């Protein structure tokens, strides 16, 4: 039997936790990664060179490779604040930016680095051009730019994306639509709902592919609420927002952590964008999705509450075997 095909969609921090474990399984992986980041090193490089931001893609490259730890530290090395124009830039971002300039696009750069790192899966930016994320709040106010959205004190109604450097309609990267249509399973998240997952899904071609695919669509719900995005959200609220943006109820299965996060990890100063544990609304989830898998997916590490990638992937593999039958 052929390996199942799984496409994982989101931002570099959240989905990397899943990809690190998933790469060890007998599965054909495609990662589709957001290009809406406009803060920090990625924002500086995209503005200076008008390229798709490299940071999320850098993290996914590392998650899907089996390079020695030292090489990983080299790729992730961040220049010191005293290093002038290089200050704050991870070396990997500069490498991606350099190859992007040589080869004409970030898409081409990632394909070259995928081969260089002997990665067996596929990694695609969701779009081949940098995108600007726009958030429309329930009070009617609109904010442009991912890094600015969380700073506005309000509840987000919906988000959309535009091309940053031209007036053309945002388009999916080559092969992304094909990957979605050919997948046995689509995995959304984990990661920031409005600023990491949805920037990919609201690209019209990706939204339409998700409507057409016969794949099982799985959402890995966040463990913690997020400042400026999902304050006071339940897990069912997360799913409702996804379905709202997709235009219909497309989430087949939701994976939800039910392990209790210790109080010491709430409102952490170390991870100041995260607030408290997401409320579990089992009845609401059952109305919003066909299948709910509630289990202990929690890993406490370095002062933060994260998904245990191995436990999540174990459930995903069990599920994909069922849907492929």
UniProtKB/Swiss-Prot annotation:
Keyword field contains Protein biosynthesis: no
Pfam families: CofD
GO molecular function, one term: LPPG:FO 2-phospho-L-lactate transferase activity
Superkingdom of origin: Bacteria
Coarse class of the protein's main subcellular location: cytoplasm
Gene3D superfamilies: CofD-like domains
Family the entry assigns: Belongs to the gluconeogenesis factor family.
NCBIfam families: CofD_related
Protein name: Putative gluconeogenesis factor
């Amino acid at each position: 039997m052929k390996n199942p095909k799984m496409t994982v969609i989101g931002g570099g921090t959240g989905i990397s936790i899943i990809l690190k474990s998933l790469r060890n399984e007998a599965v054909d992986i495609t990662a589709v990664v957001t290009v809406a980041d406009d803060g920090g090193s990625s924002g500086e490089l995209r503005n200076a060179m008008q390229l798709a931001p490299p940071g999320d893609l850098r993290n996914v490259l590392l998650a899907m490779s089996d390079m020695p730890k030292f090489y990983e530290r080299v790729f992730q090395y961040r220049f010191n604040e005293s290093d002038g124009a290089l200050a704050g830039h991870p070396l990997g971002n500069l490498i991606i930016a350099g190859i992007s300039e040589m080869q004409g696009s970030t898409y081409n750069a990632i394909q070259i680095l995928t081969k260089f790192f002997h990665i067996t899966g596929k990694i695609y930016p969701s779009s081949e051009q940098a995108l600007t994320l726009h958030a429309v709040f329930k009070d009617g106010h609109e904010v442009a730019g991912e890094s600015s959205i969380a700073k506005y004190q309000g509840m987000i109604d919906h988000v959309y994306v535009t091309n940053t450097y031209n007036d053309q309609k945002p388009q999916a990267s080559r092969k992304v639509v094909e990957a979605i249509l050919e997948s046995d399973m689509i995995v959304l998240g984990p990661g920031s709902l409005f600023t990491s997952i949805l920037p990919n899904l609201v690209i019209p071609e990706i939204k339409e592919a998700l409507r057409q695919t016969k794949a099982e669509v799985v959402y890995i719900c966040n463990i913690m609420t997020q400042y400026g995005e999902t304050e006071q959200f339940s897990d069912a609220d997360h799913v409702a927002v996804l379905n709202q943006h997709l235009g219909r109820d497309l989430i087949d299965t939701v994976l939800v952590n039910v392990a209790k996060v210790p109080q010491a990890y709430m409102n952490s100063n170390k991870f100041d964008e995260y607030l408290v544990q997401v409320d579990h609304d089992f009845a609401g989830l059952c109305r919003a999705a066909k299948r709910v898998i509630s289990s202990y997916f929690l890993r406490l590490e370095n002062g933060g509450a994260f998904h245990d990638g191995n436990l999540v992937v174990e459930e995903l593999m069990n599920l994909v075997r069922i849907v492929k039958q």
